Amino acid sequence: MSLTLRVLAPDQSVFDGTAEEVILPSTTGLIGILPGHISLVTALDIGVMRVRTNGAWNSIALMGGFAEVEADDVTVLVNGAELGDSIDATTAEAELEQAKAKVSQMEGQEPSTEKIKAQQTFNRARARVQATK
């Protein structure tokens, strides 16, 4: 038995195929999906989705969105996504270091739009790095 998985971003279809198992980064923690899973709709956080196909794990960096599970069909609608294999690890690491420095620089400051954007940039950069591993 397998799952039918579709990962859709506004500008592209990132994944459309079958999977043996999916691990989603929900806003309340990681959720594992296997064939026969109960119906579910959940919000997704910025993070890494893991997909097992043919016994091998693949990673997809997600930039937040929603997932629906219905009768072995998993549909993931996200703000943005990148296959881990397509991310340049060196560039992603450099972007993570820049984002980390920006967040550290703003530590102790009052909450602001700029501080929230810096934290989101850091979260996206971290997800991209994690997806390369």
Swiss-Prot record:
Subcellular location: Cellular thylakoid membrane
Coarse class of the protein's main subcellular location: membrane
CDD domains for the chain: F1-ATPase_delta
Zinc recorded as keyword: no
Gene3D superfamilies cross-referenced by the UniProt entry: F0F1 ATP synthase delta/epsilon subunit, N-terminal, Helix hairpin bin
Known function: Produces ATP from ADP in the presence of a proton gradient across the membrane.
Protein name listed in UniProt: ATP synthase epsilon chain
Lineage: Bacteria, Bacillati, Cyanobacteriota, Cyanophyceae, Synechococcales
